[in-house]
């Protein structure tokens, strides 16, 4: 019954697109959906060649090995750090050495924050040293630290109800984890909301799908007119323990010390490379990932994997001697973790040409075994993407789902450009996200091969179609 329903919905959805009416393109170049479908079907052999090269051939494991070399050599790549600067220099050399075209750096001013030494110790009801990670842009504590009683809450609503109890205390958030989007607001806004009710500092339960006593960092934002207070993430285990203690009526006292400090903005770069289009070089399909990371772990998963399968996509296409009609542009963003700073400045620099962008792609949710593609665009563009994804039937990755947005491509999507991202294992991703556990040990070379194949097939075919993806 489910199959019949799917078939019925699919037929209804495609009727106006496949009825023979010339609805794609403008003027005499208008084509029916059936004609475009037949055009895409002709890429079957090209798709198989890309898959064979990366999954089974001489390019297998290449993206993994390239990534391992960079992160083992450079380490984590915090915005404003020497490590990030070195990684950008290395990647520029790598892309030139790979024979890609128009390799260059585009200057960006980025935030520079350092965490310094940090610690948290529970003094009452017992002595317990707590693992913490200060949040990006947080201020530090005085040198002697902040020693105060704790108020544990599970939501902003509870904090508002108990506001008078928070004054002069450290607010601990033990918000439940249902999904990242719901929980991350406590990391982003927890300090501001705690400061509004007179708290001295805030400690937030790490935004993680799983924990082995691992704190997870990330960016947080202060609000104009609200006092700035120190803020850090603690482990799921410590947040839950203090919540249990509070429910028993225990008095909890914590000493927090943080040496965090912000510096003037630093100079950085977005890293760009291309395969120039053969027929419409001014038109662009963009593939991307971010090169910066947090200062813990290696930044292998977030977002080394996404950056390196994006590089690999161009490498595979070049290795096969392919040159699409449109320009394939690789951008490795800087300072994504500080709120998409590099991609924002790129958009400001290039937005006058947004009508020439056929598709923007971002990989920043893991490069494990993808189950499909998330896509944002018009209905006409979506059915085209469904046909493109059907070319990946040999590796059984054909789904097209909604919500293809991402921090670094949202500017373009809001401007009407279709956007795409990989659909991946989010439970695994948020187990290691922004933590000491984000290392090469998390990565799997065979899974990266498959992710790279998907990225290369989609980007090449869309770049080589006779027409750009239709917009709303």
Curated annotation (Swiss-Prot):
Cite the active-site annotation. 336 (nucleophile)
Please report the name of this protein according to its UniProt entry.
Carboxypeptidase Q
Its keywords, alphabetically, are:
Carboxypeptidase, Endoplasmic reticulum, Glycoprotein, Golgi apparatus, Hydrolase, Lysosome, Metal-binding, Metalloprotease, Protease, Secreted, Signal, Zinc, Zymogen
Q: What is its EC number?
A: 3.4.17.-
Q: Which InterPro entries match?
A: CPQ (IPR039866), Peptidase_M28 (IPR007484)
* Modification after translation (UniProt): N-glycosylated. The secreted form is modified by hybrid or complex type oligosaccharide chains.
Q: Which family does it belong to?
A: Belongs to the peptidase M28 family.
Q: Which GO terms describe its biological process?
A: peptide catabolic process; proteolysis; thyroid hormone generation; tissue regeneration
An example of a Gene Ontology cellular component annotation for this protein is: Golgi apparatus
Q: Quaternary arrangement and interactors, per the entry?
A: Homodimer. The monomeric form is inactive while the homodimer is active.
Family annotation (PANTHER family): CARBOXYPEPTIDASE Q, PROTEASE FAMILY M28 PLASMA GLUTAMATE CARBOXYPEPTIDASE-RELATED
| Uppermost EC category | hydrolase
The places in or outside the cell where this protein is found are: Endoplasmic reticulum; Golgi apparatus; Lysosome; Secreted
* Positions of the pro-segment in this chain: 21-44
- Residues recorded as binding Zn(2+) 2, renumbered to this chain, are 302, 337, 434
| Carbohydrate-modified residues | 52, 61, 179, 353, 356, 396
Question: Where would you say this protein principally sits, based on its record?
Answer: endoplasmic reticulum
> Residues that bind Zn(2+) 1, according to the entry?
290, 302, 364
Question: Molecular function (GO) terms listed?
Answer: carboxypeptidase activity; metal ion binding; metallodipeptidase activity; protein homodimerization activity
Classification lineage: Eukaryota, Metazoa, Chordata, Craniata, Vertebrata
**Function text:** Carboxypeptidase that may play an important role in the hydrolysis of circulating peptides. Catalyzes the hydrolysis of dipeptides with unsubstituted terminals into amino acids. May play a role in the liberation of thyroxine hormone from its thyroglobulin (Tg) precursor.
Q: Where is the signal peptide?
A: 1-20
Q: What Gene3D superfamilies does the record point to?
A: 3.50.30.30, Zn peptidases
Q: Which organism is it from?
A: Bos taurus (Bovine)
């Amino acid at each position: 019954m489910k199959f019949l329903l799917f078939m019925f919905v699919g037929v209804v959805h495609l009727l106006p697109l496949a009825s023979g009416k010339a609805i794609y393109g403008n003027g005499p170049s208008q084509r029916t959906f059936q004609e475009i479908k037949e055009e895409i079907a002709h890429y079957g052999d090209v798709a198989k060649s890309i898959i064979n090269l990366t999954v089974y051939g001489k390019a297998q494991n290449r993206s993994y090995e390239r990534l391992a070399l960079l992160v083992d050599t450079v380490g984590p790549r915090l915005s404003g750090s020497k490590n990030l600067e070195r990684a950008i220099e290395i990647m520029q050399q790598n892309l030139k050495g790979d024979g890609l075209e128009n390799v260059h750096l585009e200057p960006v001013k980025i935030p520079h924050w350092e965490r310094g030494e940090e610690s948290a110790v529970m003094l009452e009801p017992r002595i317990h040293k707590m693992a913490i990670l200060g949040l990006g842009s947080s201020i530090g504590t005085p040198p002697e630290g902040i020693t105060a009683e704790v108020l544990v809450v599970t939501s902003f609503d509870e904090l508002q109800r108990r506001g008078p109890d928070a004054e002069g205390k450290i607010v601990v958030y033990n918000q439940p984890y249902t999904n990242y989007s719901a929980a991350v607001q406590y990391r982003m806004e927890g300090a501001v909301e705690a400061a509004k009710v007179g708290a001295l500092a805030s400690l937030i339960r790490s935004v993680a799908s799983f924990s082995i006593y691992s704190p997870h960092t990330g960016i947080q934002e202060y609000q104009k007119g609200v006092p700035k207070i120190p803020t850090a993430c603690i482990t799921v285990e410590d947040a839950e323990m203090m919540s249990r203690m509070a429910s028993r009526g225990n008095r909890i006292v914590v000493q927090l010390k943080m040496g965090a400090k912000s510096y003037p903005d630093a100079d950085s770069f977005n890293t760009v490379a291309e395969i120039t289009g053969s027929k419409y070089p001014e038109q662009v399909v963009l593939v991307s990932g971010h090169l910066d990371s947090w200062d813990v772990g290696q930044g292998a998963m977030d977002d080394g994997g996404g950056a390196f399968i994006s590089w690999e996509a161009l490498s595979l296409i070049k290795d096969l001697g392919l040159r699409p009609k449109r320009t394939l542009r690789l951008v490795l963003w800087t300072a994504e973790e500080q709120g998409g700073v590099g991609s924002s400045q790129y958009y400001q620099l290039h937005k006058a040409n947004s009508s020439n962008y056929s598709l923007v792609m971002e990989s920043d949710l893991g490069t494990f075994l993808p189950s499909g593609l998330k896509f944002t665009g018009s209905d006409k563009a979506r059915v085209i993407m469904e046909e493109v994804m059907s070319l990946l039937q040999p590796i059984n990755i054909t789904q097209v789902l909604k919500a293809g947005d991402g921090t670094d491509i949202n500017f373009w999507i809001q401007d009407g450009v279709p956007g795409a991202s990989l659909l991946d294992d989010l439970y695994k991703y948020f187990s290691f996200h922004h933590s000491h556990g984000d290392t090469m040990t998390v990565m799997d070379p065979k899974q990266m091969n498959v992710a790279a194949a998907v990225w290369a097939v989609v980007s090449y075919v869309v770049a080589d179609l006779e027409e750009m993806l239709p917009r709303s």
